Structures are given as structure tokens and as C-alpha cells.
């Protein structure tokens, strides 16, 4: 169960980051203030929920085990930026993502 909470905390944190990115996207028509408030509001909600879940994780797992798992955030953000905004991700970056996933598997199996 704590693993699910950890993944959810990570996804909510990433969601907050992605909402912040979306808030900075240019608009072709009016409504900039509304756009900004919507996405920043969603970012605050996601980040706040992630923090609450993170505190639950820290009550159960040692920080030395839990914290490295947040490296998943780099993986989620890379995938989302590539898929949502069609950002270019060079092969070297994909290799780094693979290394992060490998490290998480190694650390997770030690827990």
C-alpha cells in the first residue's frame, strides 16, 4: 500500500510541475489571466496533495529508501513533455532515464 502512495505522491508532484509549465504556454487569444490562474491553481492543488502523501510515506519508510524513489519524477516529466508538448528528447537523455529506472529497481529491491 505504501508503494501505491509513493507512486501517487510522485505523480501528483509531476502533475504540479506540468501544470506550471502549461501556465507559461503562450495563448493566441485573450484570457491570459484566467489561463494562468487555472493552471497555477491546479499546480498548487497537485503539489499540496503530493506533500500530504509524501508525509504519509515518510511515516512508514526510511527517508534513505523513500527519497531516491522520487527520481521517478524525472522519468514522468520527460515522458509527459515528450508526449504532451512534443519536446525533443535526445538519445543521451533517454539513456539517463533508463539509468534512473535501473537505479530505482535496484534500490527498490533492497527495501
From Swiss-Prot:
GO terms for biological process: lipid A biosynthetic process; lipopolysaccharide biosynthetic process. Signal peptide: none annotated. GO terms for cellular component: plasma membrane. Gene3D superfamilies: 1.10.3730.20. It is found in: Cell inner membrane. Pathway: Bacterial outer membrane biogenesis; lipopolysaccharide biosynthesis. The chain crosses the membrane at residues 38-58, 61-81, 91-111. GO terms for molecular function: carbohydrate derivative transmembrane transporter activity. The keyword Metal-binding does not apply. Residues 40-109 form the EamA domain. It is a multi-pass membrane protein. Keywords: Cell inner membrane, Cell membrane, Lipid A biosynthesis, Lipid biosynthesis, Lipid metabolism, Lipopolysaccharide biosynthesis, Membrane, Transmembrane, Transmembrane helix, Transport. Heterodimer of ArnE and ArnF. HAMAP family: Flippase_ArnE. Translocates 4-amino-4-deoxy-L-arabinose-phosphoundecaprenol (alpha-L-Ara4N-phosphoundecaprenol) from the cytoplasmic to the periplasmic side of the inner membrane. Belongs to the ArnE family. PANTHER family: 4-AMINO-4-DEOXY-L-ARABINOSE-PHOSPHOUNDECAPRENOL FLIPPASE SUBUNIT ARNE-RELATED (PTHR30561:SF23), SMR FAMILY PROTON-DEPENDENT DRUG EFFLUX TRANSPORTER SUGE (PTHR30561). This is Probable 4-amino-4-deoxy-L-arabinose-phosphoundecaprenol flippase subunit ArnE. It comes from Salmonella dublin (strain CT_02021853). The gene is arnE.
Amino acid at each position: 500500500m505504501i508503494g501505491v502512495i509513493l507512486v501517487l505522491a510522485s505523480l501528483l508532484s509531476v502533475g504540479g510541475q506540468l501544470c506550471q509549465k502549461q501556465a507559461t504556454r503562450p495563448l493566441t487569444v485573450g484570457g491570459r489571466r484566467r489561463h494562468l490562474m487555472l493552471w497555477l491553481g491546479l499546480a498548487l492543488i497537485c503539489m499540496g496533495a503530493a506533500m500530504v502523501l509524501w508525509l504519509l510515506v515518510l511515516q512508514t519508510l526510511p527517508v534513505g529508501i523513500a527519497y531516491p524513489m522520487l527520481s521517478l519524477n524525472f522519468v514522468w516529466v520527460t515522458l509527459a513533455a515528450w508526449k504532451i508538448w512534443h519536446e525533443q528528447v535526445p538519445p543521451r537523455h533517454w539513456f539517463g532515464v533508463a539509468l534512473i529506472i535501473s537505479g530505482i529497481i535496484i534500490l527498490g529491491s533492497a527495501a
